[in-house]
Amino acid sequence: MEITEDSKRKINYQIRLATLSDIDQIIRINRSALPENYPYYFFVEHLKEYGQAFYVADLEGEVVGYVMPRIEWGFSNLKHIPSLVRKGHIVSIAVLEPFRKIGVGTSLLQNSLKAMKDTYNAEEVYLEVRVTNYPAISLYKKFNFREVKLLKHYYADGEDAYLMAAPL
């Protein structure tokens, strides 16, 4: 368990592994913060399968952010010679608006990436992000993600996405 204090607003939040009892709050955050939403069972399945890398930010019992990953085998997004690797996939990450820009997303991502590497033996990680989501792209670049590919019309509303990847 990690306690983080934000010096700007004196907010103490805890980064911890998600539990089944967090799912309703995670779905609430997903629906309020992102246009891409998933059904209840999708979150439950990811928690059951990849729970050691599925983290939430907890502020006095209220979940204010989450990161939902999965682990898979596939072709490397980073190597020039095609090779199969075990890789992490950040399926969804979101933080409630009042808790953005104070390090919550950074802490969530840091913990999940470490678990992907240490617990699940992933060699690299990837994600998709809207090309206009500049704050998220900036966050990912802090973790050495790079834009690997442009995915045209990736989202339901027609917006393009970047496929971004980083070594672990």
From Swiss-Prot:
Source taxon at top rank: Archaea
Compartments reported by the entry: Cytoplasm
A GO term for molecular function: metal ion binding
The UniProt record lists the keyword Transferase: yes
Primary location: cytoplasm
Record's catalysed reaction(s): N-terminal L-alanyl-[protein] + acetyl-CoA = N-terminal N(alpha)-acetyl-L-alanyl-[protein] + CoA + H(+); N-terminal L-seryl-[protein] + acetyl-CoA = N-terminal N(alpha)-acetyl-L-seryl-[protein] + CoA + H(+); N-terminal L-methionyl-L-leucyl-[protein] + acetyl-CoA = N-terminal N(alpha)-acetyl-L-methionyl-L-leucyl-[protein] + CoA + H(+); N-terminal L-methionyl-L-glutamyl-[protein] + acetyl-CoA = N-terminal N(alpha)-acetyl-L-methionyl-L-glutamyl-[protein] + CoA + H(+)
Domain (N-acetyltransferase) ranges: 13-168
Cellular component GO terms, alphabetical: NatA complex
Protein name per its UniProtKB record: N-alpha-acetyltransferase
Taxonomic source organism: Sulfolobus acidocaldarius (strain ATCC 33909 / DSM 639 / JCM 8929 / NBRC 15157 / NCIMB 11770)
